[in-house]
């Protein structure tokens, strides 16, 4: 495309028939601009096929385009890279990470070349942004996604390279963001259709007039009456219109599937909406928006937003270094930008929504439901967020509290995605996660059971869905079913066969204990015992056989340490049955890692409390200080979730915290322990939550004290990243509230 840009910009043209030459050049320029918009629409369509669990159709579409344009077209290579990035981040498998990294590296190079050539030519493909802007966006998108993949490998060399890429992306995104902000202001000033007609390409015939948003200038009289140009421009308009309605990948218009709420029992929207073929699931002005402009601002919002959120969650030791070299992340600004990206009906909006759902409702849940700190001080104690309960707050109006508790806005966005991509289990999985985060566990399982796992084409999504189903079943204490699902992952996913096996063994162990306690029938008691022993103690043998990293995963290292502890306890006590050498239930620990205590029902919490306090074996009865610490930590937060906050904090203060720190001359002194390193900063984090539940905003300064104390319990241990990010997210919310309250 760019080989002819020099001629199209008027450089080097000296034809004696000036007007004819100019007309010919203008027509070629217009055709190329339309072709570029067409290629972007094809790429957007291909990526949407993947989001509808039809990866092969998406890749086939890209291959067809490559037959015409070759294998070095920037947007096609980026689209392939985005598809491979999604596959890699859903599976975390090394081979897929390598493939995606190679493709994104190529997309970076092509984007830089395309941007440079577009700037030299001076030809505008946008009425809003300067030449080359769209390729600045493809460059930063390639950089950002590539850097994230590098960080996933946990290689020191790759991490250093990733920081350089993030720096490049950060600098360019900041520059583009300023252009985007200026364009948004100018659009607010002049957004009338009359202006649009004058500034965009208008085609005229005796019967009709058609305005193409994709041509950012007025057409000559010859072009305006060119039927070939008209047909091409109208084709792109129709492609965009079909994409906005969700009908571009062969599905009926998405509005016909839009439901009123979560879960299988939710009804569809009104017949009137369902029968409207013209309805779209985005802004009314979207059809009149140029494809290139849409790609630019949605891409910038997504990439800059993700970068800001990631930087805001980085532990302080690394964050301090990054801030010195110019990196600064704002969680609130980042979330707001990602929310803006979701307004666009394209892959950027979908990736943004997936990121938001992981942030709000994912297994780790960075916004702890027990820590619902508002963005500013008030005189009220904690209460459930009433932000946007009627769905009346728009994304543009979201303040700090709404960003923390998006409520119906997030639900509505997910329901739109479910309607747009009815064939994809990825969106069904996220709906189940949302139900689970709201404590609607049986409905989540019902939804997950509604799809035949074997019908899912994307192996990565299949693995995620089965794992999430297992976690949800664990929260419901249906351990045998959970174990069956976990073991089935050995044939689906290469992520960590060792942890899957250990996790399944812990499920059988808890069933064995519950059968002994009379919570379930004891007719399979011996089966549970045999399976627990077999799986827990065979898991370490699987390390390194099915892992995507050069070193063991954090949960692999956690599992290995626990198994070694059990063996050491058996040797110390001399017990014949090795299961009697296991103290505090390991499944209760894993339940905490996946946010189970915030999701369990009252009856399941009561069973958990009973199992923690009333089950006995030789390992438990020796009252080992380390096992007692974990038991009392888990018991205290179980009590808090059951509403007995006073008893919970008393237990934590008296039985847990004295083993972790003490005060000396007004300063915190840590008791460094290594037996279960995740538990020590976690206990301090949970103490901050207790203060919040007891005193609300009246004692946010003490909340901050506990969170700072937790954060400063520094150490590189197997789950330090997960625990550290959770602590930092809470500390940021507390500090924001304190700052706003004293302003």
From Swiss-Prot:
The keyword Nucleus applies. GO terms for biological process: cellular response to misfolded protein. GO terms for cellular component: cytosol; mitochondrial outer membrane; nucleus. Residues 10-24 have a biased composition (Low complexity). Keywords: Cytoplasm, Nucleus, Phosphoprotein. It is found in: Cytoplasm; Nucleus. It comes from the Eukaryota. InterPro entries: EF_Hand_1_Ca_BS, Iml2/TPR_39, TPR-like_helical_dom_sf. Interacts with lipid droplet proteins. This is Inclusion body clearance protein IML2. It comes from Candida glabrata (strain ATCC 2001 / BCRC 20586 / JCM 3761 / NBRC 0622 / NRRL Y-65 / CBS 138).
């Amino acid at each position: 495309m760019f080989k002819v840009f020099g001629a199209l910009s008027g450089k080097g043209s000296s034809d004696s028939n000036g007007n004819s030459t100019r007309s010919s050049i203008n027509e070629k320029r217009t055709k190329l601009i339309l072709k570029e918009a067409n290629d972007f629409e094809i790429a957007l369509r291909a990526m949407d096929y993947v989001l509808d669990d039809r990866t092969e159709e998406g890749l086939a579409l890209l291959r067809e385009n490559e037959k015409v344009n070759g294998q070095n077209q920037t947007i096609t290579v980026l689209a392939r890279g985005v598809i491979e990035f999604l596959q890699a981040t859903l599976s975390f498998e090394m081979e897929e990470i390598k493939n995606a990294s190679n493709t994104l590296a190529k997309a970076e190079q092509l984007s830089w070349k395309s941007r440079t050539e577009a700037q030299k030519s001076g030809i505008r493909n946008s009425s809003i942004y300067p030449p080359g802007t769209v390729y600045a966006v493809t460059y930063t998108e390639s950089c950002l996604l590539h850097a994230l993949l590098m960080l996933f490998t946990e290689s020191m060399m790759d991490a250093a390279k990733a920081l350089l890429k993030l720096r490049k992306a950060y600098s360019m995104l900041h520059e583009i963001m300023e252009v985007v902000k200026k364009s948004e202001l100018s659009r607010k000033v002049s957004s009338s259709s009359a202006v649009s007609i004058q500034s965009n390409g208008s085609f005229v015939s005796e019967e009709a007039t058609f305005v193409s948003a994709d041509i950012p200038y007025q057409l000559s009289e010859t072009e305006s009456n060119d039927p070939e140009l008209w047909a091409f421009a109208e084709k792109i308009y129709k492609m965009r219109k079909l994409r906005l309605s969700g009908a571009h990948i062969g599905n009926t218009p998405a509005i016909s599937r839009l439901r009123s709420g979560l879960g299988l029992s939710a009804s569809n929207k009104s017949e009137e909406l369902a029968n409207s073929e013209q309805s779209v699931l985005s802004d009314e002005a979207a059809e009149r928006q140029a494809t290139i402009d849409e790609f630019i601002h949605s891409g910038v919002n997504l990439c800059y937003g993700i970068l800001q959120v990631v930087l805001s969650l980085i532990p302080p030791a690394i964050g301090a270094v990054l801030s010195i070299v110019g990196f600064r992340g704002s969680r609130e600004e980042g979330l707001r930008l990602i929310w803006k990206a979701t307004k666009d009906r394209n892959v950027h909006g979908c990736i943004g929504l997936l990121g938001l759902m992981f942030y709000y409702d994912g297994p780790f849940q960075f916004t702890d439901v027990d820590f619902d700190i508002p963005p500013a001080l008030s005189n009220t104690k904690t209460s459930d967020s009433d932000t946007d309960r009627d769905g009346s707050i728009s994304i543009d109006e979201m303040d700090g509290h709404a960003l923390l508790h998006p409520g119906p806005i997030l639900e509505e966005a997910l329901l739109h995605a479910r309607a747009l991509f009815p064939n994809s289990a990825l969106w069904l999985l996220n709906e189940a996660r949302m139900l689970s985060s709201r404590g609607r566990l049986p409905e989540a399982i019902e939804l997950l059971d509604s799809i035949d796992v074997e019908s899912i084409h994307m192996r990565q999504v299949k693995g995620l869905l089965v794992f999430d189903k297992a976690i949800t079943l664990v929260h419901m204490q249906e351990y045998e079913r959970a174990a069956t699902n976990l073991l089935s992952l050995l044939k689906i996913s290469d992520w960590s066969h060792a942890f899957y096996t250990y996790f399944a063994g812990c499920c059988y162990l808890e069933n064995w204990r519950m059968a002994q306690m009379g919570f379930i029938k004891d007719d399979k008691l011996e089966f549970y015992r045999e399976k627990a022993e077999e799986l827990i103690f065979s898991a370490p043998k699987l390390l390194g056989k099915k892992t995507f990293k050069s070193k063991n995963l954090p949960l692999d290292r956690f599992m290995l340490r626990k198994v070694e502890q059990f063996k050491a306890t058996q040797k110390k006590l001399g017990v014949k049955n090795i299961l009697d050498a296991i103290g505090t239930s390991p499944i209760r620990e894993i339940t905490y890692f996946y946010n189970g205590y915030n999701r369990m029902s009252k009856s399941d919490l009561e069973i958990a409390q009973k199992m923690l306090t009333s089950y006995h074996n030789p390992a438990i009865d020796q009252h080992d200080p380390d096992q007692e610490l974990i038991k009392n930590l888990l018991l205290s937060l179980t009590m808090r979730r059951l509403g007995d906050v006073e008893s919970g904090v008393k237990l934590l203060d008296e039985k847990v915290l004295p083993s972790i720190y003490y005060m000396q001359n007004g300063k915190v002194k840590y008791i460094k322990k290594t037996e279960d390193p995740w538990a020590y900063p976690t206990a301090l984090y949970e103490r901050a939550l207790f203060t919040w539940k007891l005193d609300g905003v009246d004692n946010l300064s003490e909340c901050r004290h506990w969170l700072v104390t937790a954060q400063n319990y520094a150490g590189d241990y197997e789950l330090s990243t997960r625990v550290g990010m959770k602590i930092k997210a809470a500390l940021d919310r507390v500090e924001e509230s304190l700052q706003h309250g004293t302003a």
